[in-house]
A protein has these predicted regions:
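Mature catalytic core of soluble alpha/beta enzymes
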Residues: 2-300
Length: 300
């Protein structure tokens, strides 16, 4: 009887010891996962024709969560603002441009919010015009396919269908009053999406690091070590020459210029930045960088 008690006691002690060892191993492994380190990922499959980079200091587990937020936000909005493709069970910009003259189209809250922001920015700057989709389509075709500028007649015809007042919003419904009117949100959609991603990451607990969305740099908070952020802005005259901007605060920088996307015809460069007043590429300045707190507004 005494011998059986001794065996039972040793079994209990052994089980307790194994539980203790397992707990220590689990704690050490998870402690390692919580170690803060500088992490970086570049996503090339989330749309907007550009790589999206996230850099921050956090644990591996949190970084996986933050990367998921970036991926989800950009992929969803790439579909939402896509003017070239339709998607199943979704009204997007393609749907709007092909059907909004025939009947009002029900759009989701995010699309309406971006559309209203674009209209607000247009009321403050007439050179920014989302209703110039027909004109931009001409230049997109020239840049991506023919490498020949569109004719003056085609440009004039497209100019006749630029009119923000012919876009009507009622609640979540959008309709067009011109069958040839077309919206293009390319000048604001990526910046707007980067701003949404920033807000989602901040809400999830990330308050340091940055998002780089091809010309759109969004600082998520102050640097972990307390020093200033240093952002290089490319010179339009040399790909390896940079102008440095330094700041400690969370802010957004958006740069666009005639050196980024263009084609050359008969020794003349035609950039992707089109003036909605003339119908031709703008040639006022080579490059512009806007610094502000809101990436969507900076993009516009």
């Amino acid at each position: 009887m005494q011998k059986n008690k001794s065996i039972l006691s040793w079994l209990v002690i052994s089980v307790c010891f194994l539980i203790f060892i397992s707990s220590v191993i689990f704690f050490v492994q998870n402690k390692g996962n919580e170690t803060t380190e500088n992490l970086n990922v570049t996503l090339t499959d989330v749309g907007f024709d550009t790589p999206i980079t996230l850099n921050c200091s956090c644990s591996q587990a949190d970084f996986a969560k933050y990367t998921k937020i970036i991926r989800k936000t950009f992929k969803e909005n790439n579909k939402r603002f896509d003017q070239y493709h339709a998607y199943k069970n979704m009204n997007n910009l393609y749907t709007l441009n092909h059907e909004a003259y025939n009947h009002p189209i029900q759009m989701d809250e995010t699309f309406i919010d971006c559309l209203k922001l674009a209209m607000q920015m247009q009321s403050e700057n007439s050179q920014f015009d989302i209703s110039q989709g027909a004109l931009l389509n001409l230049w997109h075709e020239a840049r991506e396919n023919t490498q020949i500028p569109p004719s003056d007649d085609k440009i004039q015809e497209a100019l006749n269908h630029i009119d923000l007042d012919k876009i009507q919003i009622s609640g979540h419904e959008v309709s067009y009053l011109d069958p040839k009117l077309s919206i293009d949100l390319g000048a604001i959609a990526k910046g707007y999406t980067a701003q949404l991603a920033k807000e989602a990451l901040n809400k999830a607990g990330l308050t340091n690091g940055y998002i780089n969305a091809g010309g759109n740099v969004v600082l998520l908070g102050e640097k972990e070590d307390g020093t200033n952020w240093k952002i290089g802005i490319q010179s339009p005259d040399a790909s390896d020459a940079l102008v440095q901007y330094s700041t400690k605060k969370a802010t957004c920088l958006v740069t666009s210029g005639d050196y980024q996307r263009y084609f050359t015809y008969k020794n003349k460069k035609y950039s992707h930045i089109i003036d909605p007043k003339t119908g031709y590429p703008a040639n006022y300045v080579r490059s512009v960088t806007v610094i502000t707190k809101d990436s969507g507004k900076a993009d516009a």
